[in-house]
Amino acid sequence: MEYRICNGIGYLRLDRGDGVIASVLEFCRREGIRSATFSGLGGCDLAEVKTFDPETKTYGSRTLSGMLELASLWGNVTGDGNCGLAQHTHAVFAYVENGKHETAGGHLGEARVLITAEIEVRPVVGGVISRKTDPAWGTKVWDFGDR
């Protein structure tokens, strides 16, 4: 990963073998960013996408491999409530299977860069957002608390 910061916004270039989420979190740690949104695109060769099942309150997982166009990446980084960082990321991948163009998307577990990925990280200005557990679903949601 290499990056540049312009007017407070991080521009990350990920290279072959880099983890998308791992790189975003590493950038935030290096730069002392505790809350941010990010978006991006690129080419990957391995990705785990998940979908939440409200009946079981668990995530089903699917692993994609091969040439995967990272057509859309959107997520956020927040405090995890324990002095660390948490992320919530969704992605859509396009790929060819049996000669037919397909797409798959959902909550992103992680994706490995094949060619490159270009990601823009926008830090939250003037505050910090953290997470708490929603007792009804067992998922982590934004916690505005008294901040």
Regions found by a protein language model. Give the residues of each.
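N-terminal intrinsically disordered, cationic/polar leader segments
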Residues: M1-S39, D45-H88, V92-R147
